Amino acid sequence: MERDGCAGGGSRGGEGGRAPREGPAGNGRDRGRSHAAEAPGDPQAAASLLAPMDVGEEPLEKAARARTAKDPNTYKVLSLVLSVCVLTTILGCIFGLKPSCAKEVKSCKGRCFERTFGNCRCDAACVELGNCCLDYQETCIEPEHIWTCNKFRCGEKRLTRSLCACSDDCKDKGDCCINYSSVCQGEKSWVEEPCESINEPQCPAGFETPPTLLFSLDGFRAEYLHTWGGLLPVISKLKKCGTYTKNMRPVYPTKTFPNHYSIVTGLYPESHGIIDNKMYDPKMNASFSLKSKEKFNPEWYKGEPIWVTAKYQGLKSGTFFWPGSDVEINGIFPDIYKMYNGSVPFEERILAVLQWLQLPKDERPHFYTLYLEEPDSSGHSYGPVSSEVIKALQRVDGMVGMLMDGLKELNLHRCLNLILISDHGMEQGSCKKYIYLNKYLGDVKNIKVIYGPAARLRPSDVPDKYYSFNYEGIARNLSCREPNQHFKPYLKHFLPKRLHFAKSDRIEPLTFYLDPQWQLALNPSERKYCGSGFHGSDNVFSNMQALFVGYGPGFKHGIEADTFENIEVYNLMCDLLNLTPAPNNGTHGSLNHLLKNPVYTPKHPKEVHPLVQCPFTRNPRDNLGCSCNPSILPIEDFQTQFNLTVAEEKIIKHETLPYGRPRVLQKENTICLLSQHQFMSGYSQDILMPLWTSYTVDRNDSFSTEDFSNCLYQDFRIPLSPVHKCSFYKNNTKVSYGFLSPPQLNKNSSGIYSEALLTTNIVPMYQSFQVIWRYFHDTLLRKYAEERNGVNVVSGPVFDFDYDGRCDSLENLRQKRRVIRNQEILIPTHFFIVLTSCKDTSQTPLHCENLDTLAFILPHRTDNSESCVHGKHDSSWVEELLMLHRARITDVEHITGLSFYQQRKEPVSDILKLKTHLPTFSQED
């Protein structure tokens, strides 16, 4: 280091100052002038030194005379000469070299950890000495901790401990920081470039098909991008340039592990087994948590994650963290995977994936995952509305930018298909919005509660009492305890079917549904925290909605799609990778509208059992034990009234089935089509009731106020059964009946009330449910018809005794018949209603371009404790109950074995998009 400093730089000082080289003191041949310079303060000496030299003297003689003279001033002159030389050297250094030396010591650039000395130092000792150069930290220390270039680092001397390089040779070495080109070479970063529509994949040599990257930002609430998008330039550009949905609906419960595993399997938690971050399996007698070794037991993981699908079909996968990816599922790990370690820097994860993308073709994965814990971690700690969450959002936006810049460096930014996604949203917690069951139950020592917004309850003594515990008694004890109660206890088979949270032994038989922002625990000591962020609530709540952005050559450019569920993403990724999906809960083809070139063309399922005829019979009229009001128009001549011509039947079909007849996909049921003037039915001769009934209500249709509760007419097209008689239901406190097509509906001025009073239009119905059914038909149906300019209605019974969301087989139904009054009767578990209208309310249901739907799957219960109806008017709770139990058309199809809209002309993929839509409402904000 000495050679660089001014103190040891005499030779460089001479070069810097001109006077020492050119002055007389350096010229030994000009002795007189030299002496004069050495003794300028002595007049006599000066005079003698300036006297002309006697050129006639020989040098030797002159020298001899000088030696003998021994002038005493000689030593003074020599001293002065030496002083002048030293002074000249110093001045030369100061005035001639000062700029050069100062320039060297102001910066550590090129000097990091070298033991040189100067005005400032750049070795490790400078910190203790307090004389580090001003840029020591940025130039020498930060490169060990940061993954990017900045102006301090551009052109740096290569440092062995830096995470990436910004030196001039980094491109040759292949270790440049991701942003080297934009920061140090003036090129534009990915986010600075304009949007471009990538019509065809533009891939480097060796990439036969575009790779797919699934990138999760845990806990990224959909609303974050709506509110803070201006602070998130990279994600906002992906949204603008790619395919985006304002909300992606997670699965219930809205927790991390269940949702991440649903995304990669296309299955609901009840199907793939990961029903929560914490759970107990009574058959395994084992408990699962994210911090236990049990997490690595493959027995917990059902279904087929996409890296297993890829492996089966000859593709490779690389996962840098994803729930389940570090577990040997079906005997398979991803080809490259990392054991989860939350301390691994985000940048290291991104660089690893970029390095995997550079592997040789035969080693390189086709499918990749990335996972970041933010903004979930900050949301939990500080709440969703906090400066810390904003910082976390900006941080992950920078990470996405790092990825995109890295892809650009590899020329993969027009090749790779990116899915940027999150698992769920985030809600603000409050200690005042926590419910404790010990307040209601007293002694709770024998009870275990999994706390949170989707709480569950089981006995402490497991597995012995897991199945025999009195869950129903506790549910009854906790129902309707307070006005405006913010939680509802549910036996799991009564939960809204849209949640798909029942068919698993890992889901305790007793669960709790909570209002937005509310949580539940056994007592205050059993919950972790109450005032920070949380998630897990109903998956339709606005603050639980998740992020989805698709970008790359496989996705459409610059579109915003309607909300869809994350179970659809598995099929989407399979399409991007040209894989055949494993069986799953998604609807393959429902996201075709996101893709530029869909590879899968869906088709309507075929009806597996043809319709049979229900001919008129000449059986004698039977006494049904009914008492009809004389004002009701009776059916005098049944055959005349219902023996319709082909032309009449065509008109009726057009008016009652404008979108086609529901196809029956149940293999065993014998179904015949019954046509009436105002409605049509698909009647099952096996279960003695209609599977469906369809009719249309116009905006101006009138409804009668007549009471039809004890009036039936025999339908001579169907053999009469005791369950079709009024006498069977009279004074029966357990069960009554209801009409599928409402007798109150009067579409003609002359009135044809009696058609809806046929024995083939009734279904067994609990009296408590009749309250809901009547209010819907008398009040809500008219309201919806007015709001939507008419609606088509299809309704019918549901049988889901094993609560798996699928229609039960006829064999199972035979085992579920109940005996009432010595007569077998099959009582539905639910009833469904499908309302279809036009998106454009200036159109009528019979002439729709684009359809709008609203469907319900209503639990058929013996009481209305779910709604705490005591002292309430029907108007205050029935519609709220319907909205809680709304469902997708797809959910209705699965649970009934029916298929809708098969006669619509638009592509089947558009029909599937309609069927998988679930309406949302403002009260869930």
Swiss-Prot record:
<keyword id="KW-0597">Phosphoprotein</keyword>
<dbReference type="GO" id="GO:0009143">
    <property type="term" value="P:nucleoside triphosphate catabolic process"/>
</dbReference>
<keyword id="KW-0862">Zinc</keyword>
<feature type="transmembrane region" description="Helical; Signal-anchor for type II membrane protein">
    <location>
        <begin position="77"/>
        <end position="97"/>
    </location>
</feature>
<feature type="binding site">
    <location>
        <position position="277"/>
    </location>
    <ligand>
        <name>GMP</name>
    </ligand>
</feature>
<dbReference type="GO" id="GO:0030502">
    <property type="term" value="P:negative regulation of bone mineralization"/>
</dbReference>
<dbReference type="GO" id="GO:0005886">
    <property type="term" value="C:plasma membrane"/>
</dbReference>
<keyword id="KW-0219">Diabetes mellitus</keyword>
<feature type="glycosylation site" description="N-linked (GlcNAc...) asparagine">
    <location>
        <position position="731"/>
    </location>
</feature>
<feature type="binding site">
    <location>
        <position position="424"/>
    </location>
    <ligand>
        <name>GMP</name>
    </ligand>
</feature>
<feature type="disulfide bond">
    <location>
        <begin position="626"/>
        <end position="726"/>
    </location>
</feature>
<feature type="glycosylation site" description="N-linked (GlcNAc...) asparagine">
    <location>
        <position position="179"/>
    </location>
</feature>
<feature type="topological domain" description="Cytoplasmic">
    <location>
        <begin position="1"/>
        <end position="76"/>
    </location>
</feature>
<dbReference type="GO" id="GO:0005615">
    <property type="term" value="C:extracellular space"/>
</dbReference>
<keyword id="KW-0812">Transmembrane</keyword>
<feature type="region of interest" description="Nuclease-like domain">
    <location>
        <begin position="654"/>
        <end position="925"/>
    </location>
</feature>
<protein>
    <recommendedName>
        <fullName>Ectonucleotide pyrophosphatase/phosphodiesterase family member 1</fullName>
        <ecNumber>3.1.4.1</ecNumber>
        <ecNumber>3.6.1.9</ecNumber>
    </recommendedName>
</protein>
<feature type="binding site">
    <location>
        <position position="808"/>
    </location>
    <ligand>
        <name>Ca(2+)</name>
    </ligand>
</feature>
<feature type="glycosylation site" description="N-linked (GlcNAc...) asparagine">
    <location>
        <position position="700"/>
    </location>
</feature>
<dbReference type="GO" id="GO:0005524">
    <property type="term" value="F:ATP binding"/>
</dbReference>
<feature type="binding site">
    <location>
        <position position="295"/>
    </location>
    <ligand>
        <name>AMP</name>
    </ligand>
</feature>
<feature type="glycosylation site" description="N-linked (GlcNAc...) asparagine">
    <location>
        <position position="477"/>
    </location>
</feature>
<feature type="binding site">
    <location>
        <position position="340"/>
    </location>
    <ligand>
        <name>AMP</name>
    </ligand>
</feature>
<dbReference type="GO" id="GO:0047429">
    <property type="term" value="F:nucleoside triphosphate diphosphatase activity"/>
</dbReference>
<keyword id="KW-0472">Membrane</keyword>
<dbReference type="InterPro" id="IPR002591">
    <property type="entry name" value="Phosphodiest/P_Trfase"/>
</dbReference>
<feature type="binding site">
    <location>
        <position position="376"/>
    </location>
    <ligand>
        <name>Zn(2+) 2</name>
    </ligand>
</feature>
<dbReference type="GO" id="GO:0006796">
    <property type="term" value="P:phosphate-containing compound metabolic process"/>
</dbReference>
<dbReference type="GO" id="GO:0050427">
    <property type="term" value="P:3'-phosphoadenosine 5'-phosphosulfate metabolic process"/>
</dbReference>
<dbReference type="GO" id="GO:0030318">
    <property type="term" value="P:melanocyte differentiation"/>
</dbReference>
<feature type="disulfide bond">
    <location>
        <begin position="164"/>
        <end position="177"/>
    </location>
</feature>
<feature type="binding site">
    <location>
        <position position="532"/>
    </location>
    <ligand>
        <name>2',3'-cGAMP</name>
    </ligand>
</feature>
<feature type="binding site">
    <location>
        <position position="376"/>
    </location>
    <ligand>
        <name>CMP</name>
    </ligand>
</feature>
<feature type="disulfide bond">
    <location>
        <begin position="195"/>
        <end position="241"/>
    </location>
</feature>
<dbReference type="InterPro" id="IPR044929">
    <property type="entry name" value="DNA/RNA_non-sp_Endonuclease_sf"/>
</dbReference>
<feature type="binding site">
    <location>
        <position position="376"/>
    </location>
    <ligand>
        <name>GMP</name>
    </ligand>
</feature>
<feature type="binding site">
    <location>
        <position position="256"/>
    </location>
    <ligand>
        <name>AMP</name>
    </ligand>
</feature>
<feature type="binding site">
    <location>
        <position position="340"/>
    </location>
    <ligand>
        <name>GMP</name>
    </ligand>
</feature>
<dbReference type="GO" id="GO:0008270">
    <property type="term" value="F:zinc ion binding"/>
</dbReference>
<dbReference type="GO" id="GO:0030505">
    <property type="term" value="P:inorganic diphosphate transport"/>
</dbReference>
<dbReference type="GO" id="GO:0030247">
    <property type="term" value="F:polysaccharide binding"/>
</dbReference>
<dbReference type="GO" id="GO:0030643">
    <property type="term" value="P:intracellular phosphate ion homeostasis"/>
</dbReference>
